[in-house]
Amino acid sequence: MDVNPTLLFLKVPAQNAISTTFPYTGDPPYSHGTGTGYTMDTVNRTHQYSERGRWTKNTETGAPQLNPIDGPLPKDNEPSGYAQTDCVLEAMAFLEESHPGIFENSCIETMEVVQQTRVDKLTQGRQTYDWTLNRNQPAATALANTIEVFRSNDLIANESGRLIDFLKDVMESMDREEVEITTHFQRKRRVRDNVTKKMVTQRTIGKKKHKLDKRSYLIRALTLNTMTKDAERGKLKRRAIATPGMQIRGFVYFVETLARSICEKLEQSGLPVGGNEKKAKLANVVRKMMTNSQDTEISFTITGDNTKWNENQNPRMFLAMITYITRNQPEWFRNILSIAPIMFSNKMARLGKGYMFESKSMKLRTQIPAEMLANIDLKYFNDSTKKKIEKIRPLLIDGTASLSPGMMMGMFNMLSTVLGVSILNLGQKRYTKTTYWWDGLQSSDDFALIVNAPNYAGIQAGVDRFYRTCKLLGINMSKKKSYINRTGTFEFTSFFYRYGFVANFSMELPSFGVSGVNESADMSIGVTVIKNNMINNDLGPATAQMALQLFIKDYRYTYRCHRGDTQIQTRRSFEIKKLWDQTRSKAGLLVSDGGPNLYNIRNLHIPEVCLKWELMDEDYQGRLCNPLNPFVSHKEIESVNNAVMMPAHGPAKNMEYDAVATTHSWVPKRNRSILNTSQRGILEDEQMYQRCCNLFEKFFPSSSYRRPVGISSMVEAMVSRARIDARIDFESGRIKKEEFSEIMKTCSTIEDLRRQK
């Protein structure tokens, strides 16, 4: 039967059908090759938006820098970064006037955080630019390398374990005339394999010491590495994102902590909350504007889009904001918060890997690294690349480009939201002093603006005033991409509002299906996703039931675990049939062992093992969950695990699911190919950290784990803990005298070894 799809929508308001227009089925586009071109685009664009600013030279690194602050205001609609300091400060003052004590209180909260934060805060996060090796590394490794280098250069404040002390080392390192680092390199040699008698290339990893002078070190400390943003849907062009090094990260973290604290107190801020809480916040603002506009006023909403938000922001403006926000605070606190914007005003963008060239005729491929772009003959490049390189050349130093204006993506989301909200705050009648007034929502670069006025002319005047106010603060509302509607219908951060929020179900599509963790986790994650969407996203019972059946089918095909009585032949079917035949209670078999599916939409909250436990044969229970069975996962499984969900928009979300340790919760082994690369040393370091942390956790089980007070090393803490525990166990008769004295002897030996070291 043919169905005309338009018939489906006859009774559905357009907003409710919005899901069908989103590009979220199928694989998202990924980037290949280098991000060098995209990064050059970003650098060139940023300078173009600020081109009428003042040029200066950085005295330490010699990098040319463009400062657009208080520059000439644009005459036309072009995006520009000429924020006016006095306007920004005034907007901050008005924000404080409307929210008495907001800055003061946020500063006090932040000061507490600053004094308590441990340096391990910086291990969170994925890829981080590791300045010691000049490339990206996992955050924990990059931090470890930084601390290792600091200590070998007699920078030891970080040993207290407090982030603020680590940052003292960072500050001091920038005053050093030279910094000695350890670099990894590879040696290759041909040797004969004893077993196969073939010649093989053996790689050994060497470490060598290397001195950086002050200028080179500063360039590295101020460098942001760039990559291409992957998996962006609905765009034809890719774009560059930045990952900062460890020197910058700690300072940014404190600034964002302060800004987050302010955002939490602002009703127009879409950050830091998310999900249903965010929707409630938005609905409140809409309700306020609707109720006040009953008979006398009309109300319109702009679904806003800003042109190149990041590239027109300016770190110098953020410095002005911070200086104002912290103006009555102690000197040390003001200093530590002002460093991040100062570093960003002097930042360098690493251009990535460079360009790949291939000659079809000669079957040759060669890479031109970014460092060579400064002086290579441009005849090899096509016209558009030639223009890019010519433009960026004056800014290049050692393969990095000086990029003073602009912010890179995602660095100061909270602080830039405060800036945006300060403009929304100016819409109150006591500030506009006329018949129109506005309010709205701001979440990083996304905004919705609600304008109320007695007539259309008033609405137009209000929008114009908002537009011009934004320009004064370096924010460029795009007239082409923003659209206006009667209040009651708008979109904000991919939430569609039509007298209430409609579910945008397509955003959740990527998280349906089999995750590929292991049989146990995948079953749990799959049903939890369906459950969550029934709660949050209008997934109705019939559709949910269908989603569940599709999921089970998908799961069985993924793990080749069709029911024991099926005709489908797979590699596992022989074993599964054997198990099926010898099982008395077949309903008790897990789906991954060829059992039937007992899930329906009423019991999605129960882990499968629990759901079927009473139905299982006793010997099957014994094999499945026996702690003595070597195949039962012995990772200490918490009762709640976290899966990382990649929604269509925004950052990866953490999703909790129930976990039961069984023979199906296996952990795959690491791919061996890494063991032959220069990453091997890093891998060994990582394993060492892992072992140390595991050992530490054995001494301090999480229930009794208090952050160490005072300054003691992990070893000292463990030794003193061992002594206390041993004494308690000995006195209560849990251990014998010989064991007690052996423990004490071991503790003393460890301390002696530490002293000798």
Curated annotation (Swiss-Prot):
Q: Give the stretches traversing the membrane.
A: none
GO biological process entries: DNA-templated transcription; symbiont-mediated suppression of host gene expression; symbiont-mediated suppression of host mRNA transcription via inhibition of RNA polymerase II activity; viral RNA genome replication; viral transcription
Instruction: Spell out the molecular function terms from Gene Ontology.
Output: nucleotide binding; RNA binding; RNA-directed RNA polymerase activity
Residue ranges of region Disordered? 53-82
Q: Can you say where in the cell this protein is located?
A: Host nucleus; Host cytoplasm
Underlying gene: PB1
The record ties this protein, via Pfam families, to:
Flu_PB1
Q: Is Nucleotidyltransferase among the key words of this record?
A: yes
Gene3D superfamilies membership:
6.10.140.720
- UniProt PTM comment: Phosphorylated by host PRKCA.
Q: Which UniProt keywords apply?
A: Eukaryotic host gene expression shutoff by virus, Eukaryotic host transcription shutoff by virus, Host cytoplasm, Host gene expression shutoff by virus, Host nucleus, Host-virus interaction, Inhibition of host RNA polymerase II by virus, Nucleotide-binding, Nucleotidyltransferase, Phosphoprotein, RNA-directed RNA polymerase, Transferase, Viral RNA replication, Viral transcription
Location of the RdRp catalytic domain: 286-483
Position of sequence motif Nuclear localization signal: 187-195, 203-216
- Sequence segments annotated as region (Promoter-binding site): 249-256
Give the catalytic activity: RNA(n) + a ribonucleoside 5'-triphosphate = RNA(n+1) + diphosphate
**Can you tell me which family this protein belongs to?**
Belongs to the influenza viruses polymerase PB1 family.
Self-association state and partner proteins as the record states: Influenza RNA polymerase is composed of three subunits: PB1, PB2 and PA. Interacts (via N-terminus) with PA (via C-terminus). Interacts (via C-terminus) with PB2 (via N-terminus); this interaction is essential for transcription initiation. Interacts (via C-terminus) with human PKP2 (via N-terminus); the interaction competitively inhibits the interaction between the RNA polymerase subunits PB1 and PB2.
Record flagged with keyword Transferase: yes
Quote the protein name from its UniProt record.
RNA-directed RNA polymerase catalytic subunit
